[in-house]
Amino acid sequence: MVPNTPFLAAFSYTPRVRPGAVRALAAQVRHYTTPIDPSIPESKRKFVPCSGAYPLGFRVSGTHVGVKKSNITFPDLAIICSEEPCSAAAVFTTNKFQAAPVQVSKQIINARSGRGIRAVIANSGCANAVTGKGGIQDAKSMSAKVDQCIGLKATGNDGDSSTLVMSTGVIGQRLPIEKIISGIPTGYANLSSTHTAWLKTARAICTTDTFPKLLSRSFTLPSSPDRTYHIAGMTKGAGMIHPNMATLLGIICTDAPIEAPALQSLLAHSVSRSFNSISVDGDTSTNDTIAVLANGVAGGKPISSPESPEYTAMQSILTSFTQSLAQLVVRDGEGATKFVTVRVRNSPSHSDAKLIASTIARSPLVKTALYGKDANWGRILCAVGYTQGISPGTIIPERTSVSFKPVDGSPELKLLVNGEPEAVDEERASAILQNEDLEIVVDLGGGDKGEAGKGGEDGVFWFCDFSHEYVTINGDYRT
């Protein structure tokens, strides 16, 4: 069953893989060779893969059907289909106005207890959110049409449906459902397992994204060290990004064998440490869905017990993978020029560290200062000080320190040490802020535990800056 309670974890996590437990190959993040999609900004092309290691038994397609009138070129209908029934798990937005596809996909997974899922269909250009009973029927029609193409009974009943539905785009408008339904057979006929097909499918779920977000990895598990498994995922999101998730769609596929209850637990764990640890603008959307499908085609013993070495290994793999996907979303934040990691150290608890990091990440004053390359650490400290919901004694001003950590590995630039301001080298600060990547470190010194609390808990958040372009993009969004 899909939990109805918020799944945002209160602490961060950096996976540590035991030697021999998992061998994860590097993510396929490489520079484009040829051809180069001219629509992708040159600065973003390094994040688009030129090849991939995709899971067995999955085929995908991206098709243009014209959901949004202004889109006359790019694919806007994605289909991801497995040759075999899958275990499936999903996590959804906690926004009270949950879009029709969110409601329908929840019902499908619940009715099937996460078993027997065959496909995902997703459209961009229209969110199908706040569209009443008609919107619910449209989402069900999309699911049923894919089931029909697969050759399954398509009754429209939740228990019979095997296709999850996702939508993203403008809220409050009905889908051009005739275009979508008529385009589904074409998309199904074009299903392919090639890298080009995966990339085109990732492009089909984009809205204001400037590049398709696609990753793939290969790995092994302790019980089958000679057997290679694969995981691939695509995500979209550039604005309205803040936990509990936001305008985020994510589709992850693996050929590893994982039982549905274990898969749901694995996904919830990984999302709390990845997609729920990012922020672009602090807004939470109506449509967020992250789904993972496991078809087991690569063989091996199914993962079921949380106590097993395979479960532990898969947890590390999935968490690392979703973190990489989530960070691509931040790198494509609307109008963003900076990718910022904020790390809160030596907190009495994970939850307090995460709350403080989250508060810094969504501060407009911090984000605009970073855009202006201004080492205004007072704004960071201010955000730390007004963080709501933390335990008493977490923040002791005279034990708090702030610094910038450069990407080149050089020593941290200390801005505040134990509550005392440092004489900041403005020239070095300016040089650090010229870089695209930056880490802000806030050390709480153990809070009211003092020296005894040092070496305590960390919290991590990833976010971007605010630029003039962010306002322009969102001011013109519906046009």
UniProtKB/Swiss-Prot annotation:
Residues 1-32 form a transit peptide. One of its GO terms (cellular component) is mitochondrial matrix. The record marks 246-247 as: Cleavage. Substrate binds at residues 207, 236, 247, 334, 474, 479. GO terms for biological process: L-arginine biosynthetic process; ornithine biosynthetic process. It catalyses: N(2)-acetyl-L-ornithine + L-glutamate = N-acetyl-L-glutamate + L-ornithine; L-glutamate + acetyl-CoA = N-acetyl-L-glutamate + CoA + H(+). GO terms for molecular function: glutamate N-acetyltransferase activity; L-glutamate N-acetyltransferase activity. Keywords: Acyltransferase, Amino-acid biosynthesis, Arginine biosynthesis, Autocatalytic cleavage, Mitochondrion, Multifunctional enzyme, Transferase, Transit peptide. Its EC number is 2.3.1.35, 2.3.1.1. CDD domains: OAT. Pathway: Amino-acid biosynthesis; L-arginine biosynthesis; L-ornithine and N-acetyl-L-glutamate from L-glutamate and N(2)-acetyl-L-ornithine (cyclic): step 1/1; Amino-acid biosynthesis; L-arginine biosynthesis; N(2)-acetyl-L-ornithine from L-glutamate: step 1/4. The record marks 168-169 as: Involved in the stabilization of negative charge on the oxyanion by the formation of the oxyanion hole. It is an enzyme of class 2 (transferase). PANTHER family: ARGININE BIOSYNTHESIS BIFUNCTIONAL PROTEIN ARGJ, ARGININE BIOSYNTHESIS BIFUNCTIONAL PROTEIN ARGJ, MITOCHONDRIAL. Heterodimer of an alpha and a beta chain. Belongs to the ArgJ family. This is Arginine biosynthesis bifunctional protein ArgJ, mitochondrial. It comes from Coccidioides posadasii (strain C735).
